[in-house]
Amino acid sequence: METLANRLDACQETLLELYEKDSNKLEDQIKHWAQVRLENVMLFKARECGMTRVGCTAVPALTVSKAKACQAIEVQLALQTLMQSAYSTEAWTLRDTCLEMWDAPPKKCWKKKGQSVLVKFDGSSDRDMIYTSWGFIYVQDTITDSWHKVPGQVDELGLYYVHDGVRVNYVDFGTESLTYGVTGTWEVHVAGTVIHHTSASVSSTQASASDDEPLSPIRTAVSPVPAPVAASAESTGAGRAAPPTQALCSAQAPTSPPAKRQRVIVGQQHPRPDSTRTVGEGEVECYNKRSISDSNRTDPRWGHGDTDSVPVIHLRGDANCLKCFRYRVQKHKDVLYARVSSTWHWAGGNGDKTAFVTLWYTSVEQRTEFLTRVSIPKGLIALPGYMSAFV
C-alpha cells in the first residue's frame, strides 16, 4: 500500500508541475495525458484491492476510474498521431487538448480559434441559441491516420467544414429548429453579419395547410374521422346519392355542413371528443361513419358545425409532466388561453396510466398564438380539436 501511495503521489506531483508550466508544446500535452492515464489505472487497482483511500486521495468507484482511464488513452493516442503530422510544431496548450475540446462538435477532432454564432429561431430573442464556429479544424483520416487542417465555415444552413471535397455538417440549423423553433425560420448572427433563412415546412401536410391556420409545432397527418351528416339526400348535394349510414335517423334531423379532417399525431388516430348536446323532442341525431376523402384539400382541421363549439387542445402524456406544464403556463391565462382543466384519465380502460389536460381558447387565433409562443415539452402530445361550450 505504501508503494502504491508513493507512486500515486509522484504521478500527481508531475501533473501539478505540468499545470504550473502551462506549456504550449504538444509533447508536454502527451505527457499530461499519459500521467492522467497512469493515475486512473492506479486508482482502479486500488479499488480492486478494496481500498477506499490512498494517502489523501479518495478512491472512486471502479467504473469511474475505468471510464477516465479509457478517455485518457483515447486522447493520448490521438495526440501521438498528431505529433507525427506537420502540425506538431504549432502551439498546443492544455486548453487546446482537453477532453471537452475533443468531445465538442465536431467530435473526435481538434479545434482552434472558436467564435460564437447566435441563432434566433423564429426571429425571437426568447428562442436563441449560441453555437461555436471554429476557425480551424484538425480532421483525422480514418484510413491513413493522417491529419488535415481545414477551415470551419458557417452559412444559413449550419456550421460545417469541407474535407476532401465533401461538406461535413456538425451543427444543422434545420434540425435544431425542430427543437427550439416553430415556424421553421431563423436568423444567424456571426461577426456582425445577419443571415436570414426561411425553411420549408416540417411535413408535407403542414406545407399545404391553409393560410388561416399557421404552422404549429405539431407534426400533422390526415386521418378519416366520423362526421355528423344529415339523413336527407339534400345534405349530399344535388345529383348525388346519400352514403349509407349507421345510425337511427328521422326526417327532422338537422343538416350539418361538410365535415373536415382532423389534426392528429403521425402514426396515431384519436377520435374527436364527444360532447353532450340537447336534442329537441321528436328529433334524433344521425351520424355517418363514412371515410372522408378529399384530395383537393389538405387543411387538417377538425370538422365541426356547432356554433357553440370552442377550440381546445388536449395534452396527452405523463401525469407529472402535465402538472408541471400546467403550472408553467398559468402566467399566460386569459392571454394565451381561457381555461385549463385538472389532470384527468379515461375510466374503465385497460390499465393505461396516460393522463390528459384540456385547455380552452376563446378563438382559433388564440390557440394558434398559444402554439406559436409556448413550446410543448417532449413526451407530451398536443391534440387540437373542438368541444361544445359548457359552463
Swiss-Prot record:
Annotated stretches, region: Transactivation domain: 1-202
Main location: host cell
One Gene Ontology CC term in the entry: host cell nucleus
Job of this protein: Plays a role in the initiation of viral DNA replication. A dimer of E2 interacts with a dimer of E1 in order to improve specificity of E1 DNA binding activity. Once the complex recognizes and binds DNA at specific sites, the E2 dimer is removed from DNA. E2 also regulates viral transcription through binding to the E2RE response element (5'-ACCNNNNNNGGT-3') present in multiple copies in the regulatory regions of the viral genome. Activates or represses transcription depending on E2RE's position with regards to proximal promoter elements including the TATA-box.
Disordered: annotated span: 200-303
Coiled coil stretches, renumbered: none
Superkingdom field: Viruses
Region (DNA-binding domain): 309-391
Alphabetical GO biological process terms: DNA replication; DNA-templated transcription; regulation of DNA replication; viral DNA genome replication
SUPFAM superfamilies: E2 regulatory, transactivation domain, Viral DNA-binding domain
Self-association and partners: Binds DNA as homodimer. Interacts with protein E1; this interaction greatly increases E1 DNA-binding activity. Interacts with protein L1; this interaction enhances E2-dependent replication and transcription activation. Interacts with protein L2; this interaction inhibits E2 transcriptional activity but not DNA replication function E2. Interacts with protein E7; this interaction inhibits E7 oncogenic activity. Interacts with host TAF1; this interaction modulates E2-dependent transcriptional regulation. Interacts with host BRD4; this interaction mediates E2 transcriptional activation function.
Keyword Lyase: no
Post-translational modification: Phosphorylated.
Localization in the cell: Host nucleus
Keywords, ordered alphabetically: Activator, DNA replication, DNA-binding, Early protein, Host nucleus, Phosphoprotein, Repressor, Transcription, Transcription regulation
Name assigned to this protein: Regulatory protein E2
Gene Ontology MF terms in the entry: DNA binding; DNA-binding transcription factor activity; nucleotide binding
Biased amino acid composition, Basic and acidic residues: 286-303
Family: Belongs to the papillomaviridae E2 protein family.
Compositionally biased region (Low complexity): 200-209, 221-235
